[in-house]
């Protein structure tokens, strides 16, 4: 579940299913994790992307997943990028939806004043955008540390990678073959949030 309302809906509709809380659900401290445990009894939760190594180390690893690769969402915006550019596709999107075709895709990039490009996931169904970091998160240097902690699972979140890139990353993280991503960030893992 990526939002609390989803957790309630899944629990109501599919009470026999196990829940897994995504990193977008606030689980930054033990009190909130306990609250979610009492309300939804999730099988696992994904460590918040804001956690640093000390914070990750203080949480119980048995039911914790951790994103170790993937572009991190930096902002969700209701100001549609396509509409701002005069390229709104709502009529086309309505036709897609009626045919069962997904109405969201990486369709543009934003460039900042340093010429760094950020991919934008445009969701035409809800007129929203998710702007992702220009480089992927990669915690490959800390995998052994997380394994020693006994973390339940690691997650690789693919967004705009090609099939070939997906295969390279999977091989690198699962078998240690190949090379680390050329450009990456460790996010808040080393420094935490201020």
Task: List the predicted regions and their residue ranges.
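Active-site pocket-lining/capping segments in soluble small-molecule metabolic enzymes
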Residues: 1-194
């Amino acid at each position: 579940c990526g939002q609390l309302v989803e957790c309630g809906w899944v629990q109501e509709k599919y009470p026999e299913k196990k829940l897994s809380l995504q990193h977008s659900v606030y689980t930054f401290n033990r009190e909130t994790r306990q609250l979610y445990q009492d309300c939804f009894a999730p099988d696992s939760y994904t460590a918040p992307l804001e956690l640093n190594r000390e914070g990750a180390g203080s949480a119980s690893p048995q039911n914790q997943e951790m994103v170790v690769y993937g572009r991190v969402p930096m902002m969700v915006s209701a100001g549609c990028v396509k509409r701002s550019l005069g390229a709104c596709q709502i009529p086309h999107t309505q036709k897609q939806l009626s045919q069962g075709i997904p109405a969201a895709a990486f369709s543009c990039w934003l460039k900042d004043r340093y010429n760094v490009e950020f991919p934008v996931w445009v969701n035409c169904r809800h007129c929203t955008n998710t702007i992702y970091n220009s480089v992927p998160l990669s915690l490959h240097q800390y995998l052994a540390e997380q394994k020693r902690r006994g973390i339940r699972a690691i997650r690789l979140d693919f967004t705009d990678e090609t099939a070939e890139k997906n295969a390279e990353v999977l091989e690198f993280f699962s078998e240690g073959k190949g090379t680390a991503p050329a450009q990456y960030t460790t996010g808040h893992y080393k420094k935490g949030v201020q």
